[in-house]
Amino acid sequence: MSYPKKVQLPLTNYNSTGLNLNKSNLLVLYEDMLLGRNFEDMCAQMYYKGKMFGFVHLYNGQEAVSTGVIKLLNPTDYVCSTYRDHVHALSKGVPSKNVMAELFGKETGCSKGRGGSMHIFSAPHNFLGGFAFIAEGIPVATGAAFQSIYRQQVLKETEDLRVTACFFGDGTTNNGQFFECLNMAVLWKLPIIFVVENNQWAIGMAHHRSSSIPEIHKKAEAFGLPGIEVDGMDVLAVRQAAKQAVQRARQGDGPTLIEALTYRFRGHSLADPDELRSRQEKEAWVARDPIKKLKKYILDNEIANIGELNEIQNAVKTELEQAVKFAISSPEPNMSELKRYLFADN
């Protein structure tokens, strides 16, 4: 049996036309990606020290996708994630100390210690949560986009449409909920961006072996929405694609499907020895580290100097050290509230 070919490197190059990024914008992107990477590295340390339990899925290598999309959104916009949700939450503005406390199972966690790694949630930040099963977040995100349309068209509220960014992996795109929600979003012109983080592997199944059409963005054509393929290792390329999608959604023109070609630098979870991917494949993708790529862009174009970038790195390190101290010192959930939040109050 022959399978379609795998994604070939290098991917498309970034075209800067129309982004209008200044120094402040670029440093925000750089800091956000650094925060995500260092947060995940700290999670690995804490997990192996026995401070975290259960499955922990890290996001190393995929930071350009989260940062490139979410940093374009307004605070009132929505984000829906997967079980690999820590960095999406950070990009949406959930404080790192509350995400870390959640991973420690503490009362000060953003889900009161009840969600853990796979169920990060924050209502104040319109972060709709992570989901342990693939595709389960897509209907929730579609519902969030629907209520935005409903508020404007039925309740006659005057605010701009709120955009929903829905993240999921390549393995999800063979699930029926993916197709059903694409269809519904187009029918109702919902303000939603479907972001496929195609990291080439669904646990141990290579994507090119599991789909008759591995080019996921091409599936959009069947439903009548734009499908964009983008280099998910380049935050500026992702931001450019996301900018088009956000504008389209906010002005009421409907959804967009973005396929970001990316790669996770660690195994599927911290329990995965990562023996199925070849060393050559991993090295080829690691050489395209999105953080190093943006750092080089900033330095080569003399947007900031190495001292300024080191200051950002040190600030991130300090923030995460404080986040761990906060998580360790925070109280455990009270046993008397064990059954709280299972049902709606009143």
UniProtKB/Swiss-Prot annotation:
It is an enzyme of class 1 (oxidoreductase). It is found in: Plastid, Chloroplast. GO terms for cellular component: chloroplast. Keywords: Chloroplast, Magnesium, Metal-binding, Oxidoreductase, Plastid, Pyruvate, Thiamine pyrophosphate. Its main location: plastid. One of its GO terms (molecular function) is pyruvate dehydrogenase (acetyl-transferring) activity. CDD domains: TPP_E1_PDC_ADC_BCADC (cd02000). GO terms for biological process: pyruvate decarboxylation to acetyl-CoA. Heterodimer of an alpha and a beta chain. The pyruvate dehydrogenase complex catalyzes the overall conversion of pyruvate to acetyl-CoA and CO(2). It contains multiple copies of three enzymatic components: pyruvate dehydrogenase (E1), dihydrolipoamide acetyltransferase (E2) and lipoamide dehydrogenase (E3). This is Pyruvate dehydrogenase E1 component subunit alpha. It comes from Pyropia yezoensis (Susabi-nori). The gene is pdhA.
